[in-house]
Protein backbone atom coordinates (compact mmCIF):
# COMPACT_ATOMS: atom_id res chain seq x y z
CA UNK A 1 0.00 0.00 0.00
CA UNK A 2 2.80 2.43 0.79
CA UNK A 3 4.25 1.90 -2.73
CA UNK A 4 0.97 3.10 -4.25
CA UNK A 5 0.87 6.10 -1.91
CA UNK A 6 4.41 7.12 -2.86
CA UNK A 7 3.62 6.76 -6.56
CA UNK A 8 0.42 8.82 -6.12
CA UNK A 9 2.35 11.59 -4.28
CA UNK A 10 4.95 11.60 -7.06
CA UNK A 11 2.26 11.95 -9.73
CA UNK A 12 0.54 14.69 -7.73
CA UNK A 13 3.82 16.62 -7.49
CA UNK A 14 4.24 16.37 -11.27
CA UNK A 15 0.69 17.64 -11.82
CA UNK A 16 1.31 20.57 -9.46
CA UNK A 17 4.50 21.46 -11.36
CA UNK A 18 2.64 21.31 -14.66
CA UNK A 19 -0.18 23.48 -13.28
CA UNK A 20 2.37 25.99 -11.97
CA UNK A 21 4.12 26.09 -15.37
CA UNK A 22 0.83 26.58 -17.23
CA UNK A 23 -0.22 29.32 -14.81
CA UNK A 24 3.12 31.08 -15.40
CA UNK A 25 2.65 31.00 -19.20
CA UNK A 26 -0.92 32.36 -18.94
CA UNK A 27 0.19 35.17 -16.61
CA UNK A 28 3.15 36.07 -18.85
CA UNK A 29 1.05 36.13 -22.02
CA UNK A 30 -1.75 38.09 -20.33
CA UNK A 31 0.80 40.60 -19.08
CA UNK A 32 2.28 40.85 -22.59
CA UNK A 33 -1.14 41.49 -24.13
CA UNK A 34 -2.27 44.05 -21.55
CA UNK A 35 0.96 45.79 -20.65
CA UNK A 36 3.24 45.07 -23.55
CA UNK A 37 6.11 43.97 -21.33
CA UNK A 38 6.73 41.35 -18.71
CA UNK A 39 8.75 42.39 -15.69
CA UNK A 40 9.89 40.51 -12.63
CA UNK A 41 10.87 41.69 -9.18
CA UNK A 42 12.16 38.29 -8.09
CA UNK A 43 15.77 37.88 -7.06
CA UNK A 44 17.47 35.41 -9.43
CA UNK A 45 19.36 33.88 -6.51
CA UNK A 46 16.14 32.84 -4.76
CA UNK A 47 13.77 32.34 -7.71
CA UNK A 48 13.64 29.44 -10.14
CA UNK A 49 11.29 31.30 -12.50
CA UNK A 50 13.27 32.98 -15.31
CA UNK A 51 12.05 36.23 -16.87
CA UNK A 52 10.13 36.10 -20.14
CA UNK A 53 12.15 37.16 -23.18
CA UNK A 54 10.26 39.28 -25.72
CA UNK A 55 11.61 38.67 -29.22
CA UNK A 56 11.12 40.32 -32.62
CA UNK A 57 9.10 38.19 -35.06
CA UNK A 58 8.61 38.66 -38.79
CA UNK A 59 5.86 36.73 -40.54
CA UNK A 60 6.62 36.37 -44.25
CA UNK A 61 9.99 38.17 -44.13
CA UNK A 62 10.38 40.69 -46.95
CA UNK A 63 6.69 41.66 -46.96
CA UNK A 64 4.96 44.55 -45.21
CA UNK A 65 2.04 44.32 -44.71
CA UNK A 66 2.23 40.56 -44.21
CA UNK A 67 -0.44 38.91 -46.39
CA UNK A 68 -2.05 35.66 -45.26
CA UNK A 69 -3.89 34.33 -48.29
CA UNK A 70 -6.66 31.85 -47.54
CA UNK A 71 -6.18 30.08 -50.85
CA UNK A 72 -3.31 27.74 -51.72
CA UNK A 73 -1.55 25.21 -49.57
CA UNK A 74 1.93 26.68 -49.32
CA UNK A 75 3.72 26.93 -46.00
CA UNK A 76 4.05 30.24 -44.14
CA UNK A 77 7.54 31.38 -43.14
CA UNK A 78 7.94 33.02 -39.74
CA UNK A 79 11.27 34.31 -38.44
CA UNK A 80 12.38 34.91 -34.89
CA UNK A 81 14.90 37.65 -35.54
CA UNK A 82 18.34 37.61 -34.00
CA UNK A 83 19.53 40.76 -32.22
CA UNK A 84 22.56 41.86 -30.22
CA UNK A 85 20.82 40.39 -27.15
CA UNK A 86 19.26 37.31 -28.81
CA UNK A 87 21.28 34.44 -30.23
CA UNK A 88 18.64 32.36 -32.04
CA UNK A 89 20.80 29.23 -31.78
CA UNK A 90 19.91 29.29 -28.05
CA UNK A 91 16.19 28.73 -28.80
CA UNK A 92 14.95 25.17 -28.20
CA UNK A 93 13.43 24.55 -31.63
CA UNK A 94 11.13 21.78 -30.41
CA UNK A 95 9.45 24.26 -28.04
CA UNK A 96 8.44 26.81 -30.70
CA UNK A 97 4.71 27.27 -31.36
CA UNK A 98 2.77 29.76 -33.49
CA UNK A 99 -0.81 29.95 -32.21
CA UNK A 100 -0.08 26.58 -30.51
CA UNK A 101 1.05 25.05 -33.86
CA UNK A 102 4.42 23.29 -34.15
CA UNK A 103 6.60 24.21 -37.13
CA UNK A 104 7.04 21.77 -40.00
CA UNK A 105 10.74 22.57 -40.33
CA UNK A 106 13.26 25.29 -39.48
CA UNK A 107 16.59 26.74 -40.51
CA UNK A 108 18.96 29.49 -39.45
CA UNK A 109 19.73 32.28 -41.91
CA UNK A 110 19.67 36.06 -41.99
CA UNK A 111 16.36 37.21 -43.49
CA UNK A 112 15.27 40.50 -41.89
CA UNK A 113 15.95 43.42 -39.59
CA UNK A 114 13.58 43.70 -36.59
CA UNK A 115 10.69 46.17 -36.76
CA UNK A 116 11.57 49.07 -34.45
CA UNK A 117 8.37 48.65 -32.40
CA UNK A 118 8.46 44.88 -31.97
CA UNK A 119 7.38 45.23 -28.31
CA UNK A 120 4.17 47.09 -29.27
CA UNK A 121 0.99 46.30 -27.43
CA UNK A 122 -2.45 45.62 -28.88
CA UNK A 123 -4.61 46.34 -25.85
CA UNK A 124 -6.95 49.27 -26.44
CA UNK A 125 -5.54 50.13 -29.85
CA UNK A 126 -6.72 49.51 -33.38
CA UNK A 127 -4.41 47.05 -35.08
CA UNK A 128 -2.36 48.47 -37.90
CA UNK A 129 -1.32 46.38 -40.88
CA UNK A 130 1.94 48.31 -41.16
CA UNK A 131 3.31 47.25 -37.75
CA UNK A 132 6.00 45.39 -39.69
CA UNK A 133 9.07 45.85 -41.85
CA UNK A 134 10.14 44.79 -45.32
CA UNK A 135 13.80 45.51 -44.63
CA UNK A 136 16.09 42.68 -45.61
CA UNK A 137 19.02 41.04 -43.84
CA UNK A 138 20.87 42.88 -41.08
CA UNK A 139 23.90 40.64 -40.57
CA UNK A 140 22.44 38.65 -37.65
CA UNK A 141 21.25 35.06 -37.89
CA UNK A 142 17.49 34.52 -37.62
CA UNK A 143 15.52 31.35 -36.85
CA UNK A 144 13.21 30.81 -39.83
CA UNK A 145 10.33 28.42 -39.20
CA UNK A 146 7.77 27.08 -41.65
CA UNK A 147 4.16 26.45 -40.59
CA UNK A 148 1.17 24.87 -42.32
CA UNK A 149 -1.07 27.64 -43.65
CA UNK A 150 -4.05 25.33 -43.27
CA UNK A 151 -3.30 24.85 -39.55
CA UNK A 152 -2.82 28.60 -39.01
CA UNK A 153 -6.15 29.40 -40.66
CA UNK A 154 -7.87 26.74 -38.54
CA UNK A 155 -6.32 28.22 -35.38
CA UNK A 156 -7.43 31.82 -36.11
CA UNK A 157 -10.98 30.78 -36.99
CA UNK A 158 -13.49 32.76 -39.03
CA UNK A 159 -12.06 35.80 -40.83
CA UNK A 160 -13.03 38.36 -43.45
CA UNK A 161 -11.01 39.82 -46.29
CA UNK A 162 -8.78 42.61 -44.96
CA UNK A 163 -8.88 41.53 -41.31
CA UNK A 164 -5.68 42.42 -39.44
CA UNK A 165 -4.72 39.75 -36.91
CA UNK A 166 -1.93 39.31 -34.38
CA UNK A 167 -0.19 35.93 -34.43
CA UNK A 168 1.89 34.99 -31.40
CA UNK A 169 4.95 32.81 -31.06
CA UNK A 170 5.92 31.08 -27.84
CA UNK A 171 9.07 29.09 -27.15
CA UNK A 172 11.77 28.45 -24.56
CA UNK A 173 15.48 28.96 -24.73
CA UNK A 174 17.84 26.10 -23.93
CA UNK A 175 18.04 27.33 -20.32
CA UNK A 176 14.24 27.06 -19.99
CA UNK A 177 13.35 30.77 -20.05
CA UNK A 178 10.03 31.48 -21.80
CA UNK A 179 10.10 33.40 -25.08
CA UNK A 180 7.19 35.31 -26.64
CA UNK A 181 6.81 37.43 -29.76
CA UNK A 182 4.15 38.60 -32.19
CA UNK A 183 3.53 40.02 -35.64
CA UNK A 184 0.51 41.07 -37.68
CA UNK A 185 -0.99 39.53 -40.82
CA UNK A 186 -3.65 40.79 -43.22
CA UNK A 187 -6.20 38.22 -44.38
CA UNK A 188 -6.56 38.05 -48.16
CA UNK A 189 -9.53 36.18 -49.61
Where are the regions that the model predicts?
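Ser/Thr/Pro-rich, low-complexity mucin-like regions
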Residues: 158-188
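Residue-level detector of buried hydrophobic side-chain packing
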Residues: 82, 96, 169-171
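Short, solvent-exposed loop/turn segments enriched in Ser/Thr/Gly
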Residues: 72-78, 92, 162-166
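Short amphipathic, basic-aromatic surface patches that mediate peripheral association
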Residues: 63-66, 80-88
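N-terminal secretory signal peptides that target proteins for export/translocation
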Residues: 1-16
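Boundary/junction segments of secreted and surface-exposed precursor proteins
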Residues: 38-76, 189
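Acidic, glycine-anchored loop motifs typical of Ca2+
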Residues: 66, 70-71, 104-105, 111-154, ...
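Bacterial N-terminal signal peptides
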Residues: 22-34
Amino acid sequence: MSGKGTKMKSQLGTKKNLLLSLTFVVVALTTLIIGGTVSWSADYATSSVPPTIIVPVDIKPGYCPNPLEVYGSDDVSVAILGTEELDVSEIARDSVRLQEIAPLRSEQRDVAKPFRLYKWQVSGKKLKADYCTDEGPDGKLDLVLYFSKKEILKAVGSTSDGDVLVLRITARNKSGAPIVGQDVVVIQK
